[in-house]
Amino acid sequence: MYAVFQSGGKQHRVSEGQTLRLEKLDVETGATVEFDKVLLVANGEDIKVGAPLVEGGKIVAEVVQHGRGDKVKIVKFRRRKHSRKQQGHRQWFTEVKITGINA
């Protein structure tokens, strides 16, 4: 059984027991989170596709940890001008474990 849901402006394909990183959610570690924007639920041959959402669809997950991703360097360089600008960025994330898929 798997499902596709939307969180943080992105779509994720998940199954029960899977751990994934989402954009930072404002919840405590160990708390339970419910995602209502379920786009598709598939259980073997039985597939429910939402228009745009699956009615009564819900994904339950447990927050494992919060953290920051790897550093991404941004470099701006102007040729022949002796000008260079460098900046770094680390994106916050929330790691969740999917505990249930309801349709």
Curated annotation (Swiss-Prot):
Gene Ontology CC annotations of this record: cytoplasm; ribonucleoprotein complex; ribosome
A UniProt-annotated Pfam family: Ribosomal_L21p
InterPro entries: bL21-like, bL21-like_sf, Ribosomal_bL21, Ribosomal_bL21_CS
Keywords: Ribonucleoprotein, Ribosomal protein, RNA-binding, rRNA-binding
Membrane-spanning segments: none
One Gene Ontology biological process: translation
GO MF terms held by the record: rRNA binding; structural constituent of ribosome
Keyword Ribonucleoprotein: yes
Subunit comment: Part of the 50S ribosomal subunit. Contacts protein L20.
Protein family (similarity comment): Belongs to the bacterial ribosomal protein bL21 family.
Family matches, as HAMAP family: Ribosomal_bL21
Function: This protein binds to 23S rRNA in the presence of protein L20.
Record's protein name: Large ribosomal subunit protein bL21
Lineage: Bacteria, Pseudomonadati, Pseudomonadota, Gammaproteobacteria, Vibrionales
